[in-house]
Curated annotation (Swiss-Prot):
Protein family (similarity comment): Belongs to the methylamine corrinoid protein family.
UniProt domain B12-binding: residue ranges: 145-272
Protein name: Methylated-thiol--corrinoid protein MtsB
InterPro entries in the cross-refs: Cbl-bd_cap, Cobalamin-bd, Cobalamin-bd_sf, Met_Synthase/Corrinoid, Meth_synthase_dom
GO BP, sorted A to Z: homocysteine metabolic process; tetrahydrofolate metabolic process
One GO cellular component term noted in the UniProt record for this chain: cytosol
Gene, per the UniProt record: mtsB
UniProt KW keywords: Cobalt, Metal-binding
């Protein structure tokens, strides 16, 4: 039995080198974690559900209750708790970043280890958006920090990550032009021209469509507008293979990149600042 496991691990390691796209897909689907194998770091213990929840749980008990409501996908409870905190005078942006976001972050990390599934992410995302809408309404009109076009690249219909990025950008004072999913390079460039956007954020969940991000970054270069790239199919090594682009691992990275670009820094400077 042990010999069979050793052979399986050897085959998996060979796959990592020879078929990185297939390896990445298996990692994303939680198959490796399900086997109890951590191939990123042989000395690292497999993260548990409790570790993830404890790491992301807000220290403030009221904020922790909001995060838990998001994790459970409980729209009514999320709205109730956020409304009460806003009435107490809590800052809307602080609520988004430190009460709502920890909830969705937890669900996404649980998904990464095979302890959460797409329906649960969808429910948590809906609860998150209900809370964000309340915070945006309370915050009202504020001076825009800049314009960001947000999209999922052509060929990909998965927009949960894009929606989260758009929500957190709006919560931080950016005007977001949301083009939706399955967006062509031509449509994205046209949107940049018509809106005079400062930045484009592009995501993809599938390795088969990530080449579209490279094409988009190249097409945006003559416009002087960089592309912030993210999503399950994308990593820093891939984004570093082409210019006019910055890799963001988390939604908060998108905010950092947007701030750098809207302050007048180049994509190279933004990339160096983030890395």
């Amino acid at each position: 039995m042990i010999r069979h496991i050793d052979l399986a691990v050897q085959n998996i390691l060979e796959m990592k080198e020879k078929e990185p796209a297939k390896f990445k897909r298996l990692i994303d689907e939680g198959i490796m974690i399900g086997l109890g194998v951590d191939l990123e770091d042989g000395n690292k213990e497999v993260t548990t559900v409790d570790q993830i929840k404890n790491q992301n749980r807000p220290k403030d008990p009221e904020y922790a209750s909001v995060a838990e409501a998001v994790i459970e996908g409980n729209n009514a409870e999320t709205v109730k708790l956020i409304s009460a905190l806003l009435e107490k005078g809590k800052d809307p942006t602080d609520l988004v970043l430190n009460a709502l976001m920890p909830g969705i972050q937890t669900v996404c990390e649980l998904y990464d280890i095979g302890e959460s599934y797409v329906p649960e992410i969808l429910l948590a995302n809906e609860a998150l958006m209900k809370g964000v809408e309340l915070c945006q309404k309370k915050k009202g009109e504020v001076p825009s920090q800049g314009k960001v076009v947000s999209l999922v690249i052509v060929g990909d219909l998965h927009d949960i990550g894009k929606n989260i990025v758009a929500a957190i950008l709006r919560a931080n004072g950016f005007e977001v032009i949301d083009l939706g999913r399955d967006v062509t390079v031509e449509a994205a460039v046209e949107a940049v021209k018509s809106t005079k956007a400062n930045l484009v954020t592009g995501t993809t969940l599938m390795s088969t469509t990530k080449g579209g991000l490279k094409a988009l970054a190249n097409a945006l270069e003559p416009e002087g507008v960089p592309l912030a790239c993210g999503g399950a199919a994308v990593d820093r090594r891939f984004v570093d293979t082409f210019g006019n682009s910055v890799y963001g691992r988390t939604p908060l990275d998108a905010v950092k990149i947007a701030k750098e670009i809207c302050e007048g820094k180049s994509w190279e400077e933004a990339r160096n600042e983030l890395y």
